[in-house]
Amino acid sequence: MQQRASSTHVGSQSAAHALLEKVAGSAIGLDLELPIATGERRRRIYLDSTASTLRLGVVQDVLDRYQPYYANTHSTVHFGARLSTQEYRWAHDMVLDFVGADKQRCTAFFVGSGTTGGMNRVAATLSQRLPGRDVVITSIMEHHSNDLPHRKYFKTVVHASPEYGSTSMGCVDLKAIERALEANKGRVAYVSVTGVSNVTGIINPIREIAALAHAHGALMVVDAAQMIAHVPIQMSGNANPAHDIDIVVFSGHKIYAPGSPGVVVARRELFEGGVPVEVGGGMVDDVWLDRFTPTASLPDREEAGTPNITGAIGLGAALYALHRIGMDTLFEEETELMQLALGKLSAMPEIAIYGDTDMCRYPRAGALSFNVRGMHHALTAAILNDYFNIAVRNQCFCAHPYVREMVTEALAASDDGLTAAELEALAEMQRGMVRASFGIYTTREDVAVLAAALADIIARRDFYEQQYDVTPTGDYQHKTFRFQSEAQFNIRDAVDTWLTR
């Protein structure tokens, strides 16, 4: 495997790093080679882990071992059902351990559509449980999944602003959170913020935000979709109880188990009593023609229907593997990698990096977003893919308000003399960024290749721009090179091959 960020720790840390190397190197797809516009084949560099991570080999191995025993849960009468039920329950316990949740006070349950499904469940449930509190406080940094559900179920959603560092926006402004709590005293149901921005990777001070929320009688909800794979989480048992988190929501596909469900971890009393938002099989004690009795048992009452058993077991395997490594070790490694990436990109004046880059003041994890000045983000992403086989993401990353604010801020700093209306119009036209995001398998060499590719794009801008046409949808399409996806893989041919061999 390629060289990773260096470490000076010894002893138990050496063992942890050995496990890290083994687990990281097992990720499926690291050696994938694909044709590029030059006619060569090149190994893919996967820098899109914030969107979805690659599956770890250990997860695939666990699923392969489990699959012969597969059966539905909700029964222990036959061996397969008994085994599936036991391991499905173990996956719940592993979730609680991984986020540092008190097992006596907290429950974990799985939901179908990732963090989005989890946040919708949280908002719908708490709007019923807290009828006198019709305000939710969040921030402008949020992914739509930690914004729109609150808008749907609550009368008012307040979007707290970020701090401003020496160069750009930083983390959520604690003073803005406090002002919003004071202005809506007695009405705030909960504060819900992302632990780590899916755009900039900036880490928010969730413990301090929790203390503010609790001081005003509000709950603290953390969108951990991006945090879960990069930063240690301690939900319960903090030295200061005010720092404890009431609800954590995340997605399994963000933590090396694609195909696994979303997860809600919450204080039990918040989901006890009443009728759950989703009803069906498995969440009732009894049903008559004119009524039904929901079970009081958690997590069963929040998991109507047949669960994603295989996905949950895969998630449990991923969490246990990372638990064996230690999230502190992983965070240390990834911090070094982020510092390396920021250093290389910051050295290029033609690159605009979004969010304040002072990692001492505003630590980051997992992702950074940028643009080549004067080049459309879609073109930059297309060139990185077509000529270098570097997989990045572009556009607004389901965080339109945040991206709009940062693009406008950058344009205002570089384009003197524009009126407010002209600036707004230009920002809308250029709204979007390129995002490079890292996983446990990202190496120093991957970062170096990205930096070299960007340097080449800057040096040969005219050449690259001449190779592309703009499509009616605003995408950039190479004039001569076409990636034939069906030649690489398609479901029909894969089935036909199996059937005829």
Put a short name on every predicted segment.
Residues M1-R501:
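Pyridoxal 5′-phosphate
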